[in-house]
Amino acid sequence: MYKVVLIRHGESVWNKENKFTGWSDVDLSEKGNEEALKAGKQLKKDGFTFDLAYTSVLKRAIKTLWNVLNTMDLLWTPVVKDWRLNERHYGALQGLNKAETAAKYGEEQVKIWRRSYDIAPMALDENDERYPGKEARYSGLLKGEIPLAECLKDTVARVVPYWGKEVVPQIKAGKKIIIAAHGNSLRALVKYLDNISDSNIVNLNIPTAMPLVYELDENLKAVKNYYLGDPEAVKKAMETVASQGKVKK
């Protein structure tokens, strides 16, 4: 039996402001830092330890991981950063307020953009200042690898192969692994691990900075999963995520 821990980054500044973030490299809010520290304490309390960590190339996930490992006195842990664990790219929606966008386009349309499996939002133009190809961190990527917008299906197409090629061999080698990533890159992985249908994935919401433990059999198939901490707090946090795309009243 293997275990792997997944954790979404703590609340970011744009989560707090209810904005679409995607590949925009915004920082953690004060609350987000506190959430990550709390997650580290919970993991330590429950006896978890790690000897390998994975995260994206976006600071909100990197800092969440750092806070968790620091709290657990595990800062020596090797960390692999990879763009394939980035949040899904929200295209031209990045930087827009979700509630204001819902007021303009309708809550149902925003829910489709946020949670559907195969419908991407409006794409960025390559001349847009938000285009990732302008950033040094993506200089090693081919032009065709840099998204202008993504749906969850696109995110699955980069996250799941990365899991299979890079993470699975390390789990089989006995490494104790934590993956600190994003709402949609983790939804992509959870969809695969739990074999969630394209239609049902719309209802899955992952709360910020709450450790999600997967127990896997010898074939790396999910046997069970559970969040650490208070179940009511987890439920409330999921509801908060689900409500972000609604018109503000």
Curated annotation (Swiss-Prot):
One of its GO terms (molecular function) is phosphoglycerate mutase activity. CDD domains: HP_PGM_like. The keyword ATP-binding does not apply. Gene3D superfamilies: Phosphoglycerate mutase-like. The active site is at H9, E87. InterPro entries: His_Pase_superF_clade-1, His_PPase_superfam, PG/BPGM_mutase_AS, Phosphogly_mut1. The keyword Ligase does not apply. Its EC number is 5.4.2.11. PROSITE patterns: PG_MUTASE (PS00175). Pathway: Carbohydrate degradation; glycolysis; pyruvate from D-glyceraldehyde 3-phosphate: step 3/5. GO terms for biological process: gluconeogenesis; glycolytic process. Substrate binds at residues 8-15, 21-22, 60, 87-90, 98, 114-115, 183-184. It holds the Pfam family His_Phos_1. Catalyzes the interconversion of 2-phosphoglycerate and 3-phosphoglycerate. Belongs to the phosphoglycerate mutase family. BPG-dependent PGAM subfamily. This is 2,3-bisphosphoglycerate-dependent phosphoglycerate mutase. The gene is gpmA.
